[in-house]
């Protein structure tokens, strides 16, 4: 098996058709079929189901596709680093962030990459924190800013900052912003919580899973959309537990208020994560440094109300 065979395999997988795949990689259809057959012989298992209208990947084909993408990307990055020479930041890098991370440093990160690293192609993915972690676990992103990630042996995590969570909503529901509210009182409020997929609220909400479970029991709605959540809050459909950064624009405009929660205070921790089996490239090292620098700057200037983890 070599890189050419993997490229051919990926073309067939993505096109689901030998003829279209052959056109994509510019080889004869018979030659492409021969390479796929050789791969199947090497793995001793079918990679595709041959049908009259195309080719569907088998379970083995699905697994090989994920590995092939990672292998070819690693090879391309290795070639770029060797060709460009030491410490030249080039190639491709993909970074995943939760909404808060993008809101705080996304624009400046993109601006810096465009101006300082013209040979680097950045892909920035925004999603809920749980989805961001999944993007990292399947190697769709190289680095990820994730709240309260689980302890997984596959992950290398670096605590970056700690944020306080507030009760956020319209004054009629939340009450006076200057007066703290006790945690036990939250159960009497119409809470709307973010949810990722079919599971419970994202671990990103709180550091304490026991408190998170108690909040879950009080929720009247769950949302898998930042836009939907914000709209519901402004319309007074409910209130939520969030950071001030989450609703920064609405708080500044007076459409929403944030009320401190006490007994206990609610916090969450942001981590910079990467996969343990993914070697650090020059680009990854530089983006890690840049992201940490931008975050620290936002915290020092008060734009991101949080405490840096030393």
Label the predicted regions.
Residues 90-153:
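Central regulatory/effector-binding core of bacterial HTH transcription factors
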Residues 155-192:
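Flexible hinge/capping segments at coil-to-helix
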Residues 40-57:
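A short LG(V/I)-centered, amphipathic sequence patch enriched
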Residues 42-43, 64-86, 287, 291, ...:
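Alpha-helical linker/hinge and terminal dimerization helices associated
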């Amino acid at each position: 098996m070599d890189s050419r065979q993997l490229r051919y395999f990926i073309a067939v997988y993505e096109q689901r058709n030998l003829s279209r795949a052959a056109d994509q990689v510019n080889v004869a259809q018979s030659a492409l079929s021969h390479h796929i057959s050789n791969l199947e012989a090497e793995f001793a298992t079918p990679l595709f189901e041959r049908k009259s209208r195309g080719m569907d990947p088998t379970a083995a084909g699905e697994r090989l596709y994920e590995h092939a993408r990672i292998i070819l990307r690693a090879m391309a990055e290795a070639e770029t680093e060797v060709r460009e020479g030491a410490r030249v930041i080039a190639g491709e890098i993909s970074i995943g962030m939760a909404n808060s991370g993008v809101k705080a440093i996304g624009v400046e990160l993109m601006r810096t990459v465009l101006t300082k690293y013209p040979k680097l192609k950045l892909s920035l993915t925004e999603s809920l924190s749980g989805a961001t972690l999944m993007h990292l676990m399947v190697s769709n992103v190289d680095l990820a800013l994730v709240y309260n990630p689980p302890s997984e042996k596959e992950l290398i995590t670096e605590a970056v900052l700690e944020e306080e969570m507030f009760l956020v909503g319209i004054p009629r529901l939340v009450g006076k912003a200057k007066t703290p509210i006790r945690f036990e009182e939250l159960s009497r409020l119409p809470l709307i919580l973010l949810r990722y997929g079919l599971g419970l609220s994202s671990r990103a909400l709180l550091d304490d899973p026991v408190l998170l479970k108690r909040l879950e029991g009080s929720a009247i709605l769950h949302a898998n959309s930042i836009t939907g959540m914000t709209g519901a809050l402004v319309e007074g459909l409910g209130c939520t537990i969030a950071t001030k950064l989450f609703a920064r624009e609405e708080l500044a405009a007076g459409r929403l208020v944030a009320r401190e929660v006490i007994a206990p205070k609610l916090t969450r921790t942001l981590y910079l994560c990467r996969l343990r089996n993914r070697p650090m490239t020059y680009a990854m090292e530089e983006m890690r440094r840049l992201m940490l620098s931008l975050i620290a700057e936002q915290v020092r200037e008060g734009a991101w109300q949080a405490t840096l983890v030393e």
